[in-house]
Each structure stands twice: as C-alpha cells, then as structure tokens.
Amino acid sequence: AASDVYKRQTAYIVFMLEAMADIARILGKDDDRRLYEKNAARARKGYSALVTTKKFSIDTDRQAKLVRPLYIGLLDEKQTEYAKKRLIKALDNYSWRLGTGFLSTPLILSVLADIDIEYAYRLLENEQMPGWLFMPKNGATTIWESWEGTKAQGGIASLNHYSKGAVCEWLFGTMCGINVTGENKFKISPRPGGHFEFAEASYDSVYGKMFVRWDKTDGGYKYKISVPSNCQADIILPDGRKQTVGAGEYEF
C-alpha cells in the first residue's frame, strides 16, 4: 500500500538525517548539524501524523511495522509501550519465527533485547524456518540468501549472503558485549541468556585481540575478559557491576 511506502521511507529519512546530524556535530560543522536536525524534526512530525491519523496501524502482526519505529524511536511513550506488547503478540502468533524482511531483520534482536533479553534469545534459538538456527540444523556452513536454502522444486538459492548475516553484529555486540568506542577504547557489556551454556567472541584491534567469554554456572554466570595492550575497557555486567580497566586479563 502507498501508506506503507510513505511510512517506511519517512522512517529511514529520520534515521539518516539524525545520523548525519550526529556526524556533523562530531566534525564541528554546526550549520550542517542544525540543518539536518531541522529536517529530521520535520520528518518525525510527518511520521507521527501517519500514525495518529491511522493511515497505518501499529495493531498488526507484521513484525517489521513494529520493529522499525521501535528501533528508530519514532513513537510516543504510549505508542511505544503498545508496540512492544504488540510485537511480542505478533511473535507468539507466528510461533516465534522471524517475519521481518531485508531491512528489519538486522534490528529485531536489539529491539527485543531492550524489552527483555530472554525474548531476544527465544527468537535466536528458534530452529524452525524462518530462523537463523534452521540453517546450521540443516547443514549450512554459511548464511543463506533465502531461509529455506533449497527451493521446493529442488533449485538452490545463494548459499552465501549477508542480508540475514547481520545477526553476527548482535552476537558480538550484545550476546558477548564487545563494542568499540574509540581507537583503543571499548565498552564490554555481555548479556547472557537463553539456553546457551557459554559464548565467546574476539575482536582483532590494531593493538591486539579483545576477548570475551561467559559461562553458565550453577549460581549464575562467570566472565573472562582479555584487554589488549594500550587499551581501556569500560566493563558493565548484567548485575550492575561497572569497572574501567586497562590491558590485562580479568575474571568476574
């Protein structure tokens, strides 16, 4: 529908203009920043009008229609709370299988983690099609272009495609919590959950390897973090503990 096109395009106009405003701020280009912020505000107002005039509804089972405005932050407080609940209902109605497309699949786990980390793990652990774990369960060693991998007629789609591989960003940045915040600075904020017994990831920086691993224990979780030379890491654990550390190996 035309309103769907307007909604999708307007959402990404907001996203891109606000990203450009942030870049301009970092570069000290205040005139550009003000221009981008002004146009982003206008686009936000236009998106809000589409919702409030009910030209499109957030009472929907279409996961992308809920994920996109939640991720970009386009809804007011009341609408946001409703959209979160409606997204969980939409996933329940689809047996916790992915129903997002090319644009929203990279966003859905982050949106769910903001609601409750266990929702994100529940979706990640789905082994039915459409779902990430359906691929390795059926012999995949790469990310398929199509969820089913092989077509019903016997044809094979691309077996090496990025569109659904954006899940790796969530595995590194949320599950294992490795986030680069500067040339030699990191934020380490692992968020374990689901039925996983352990997870580990590493990032090869110009100063050496940043390594994070967590293991499930009888009493909770234990963490092992290795920070490379000449680097600093702000460690934030799920129980609220925070610590800024330099190079070295740490266990919590």
Feature annotation, model-predicted:
Residues A2-Y6:
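Short, small-residue-biased leader/transition segments that mark boundaries at the very start
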Residues K7-T10, R33, E37, I58-T60, ...:
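Hydrophobic alpha-helical scaffolding
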Residues Y12-F15, A19-D22, L35, R42, ...:
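Extracytoplasmic/secreted proteins, especially bacterial periplasmic and envelope-associated proteins
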Residues Y12-K29, V67-K78, P106-I115, G173-G177:
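Well-ordered alpha-helical scaffold segments within catalytic/enzyme domains
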Residues A24-I26, D31, G248-F252:
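Acidic/polar, glycine-enriched structural segments that form the non-catalytic walls/loops
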Residues E37-F56, D76-W96, I115-M135:
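Long, well-ordered core segments of solenoidal/helical folds
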Residues K38, E118, R122-F252:
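Non-catalytic C-terminal accessory modules of carbohydrate-active enzymes
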Residues T60-L66, G99-S104:
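Generic helix N-cap/helix-start motif at coil->alpha-helix transitions
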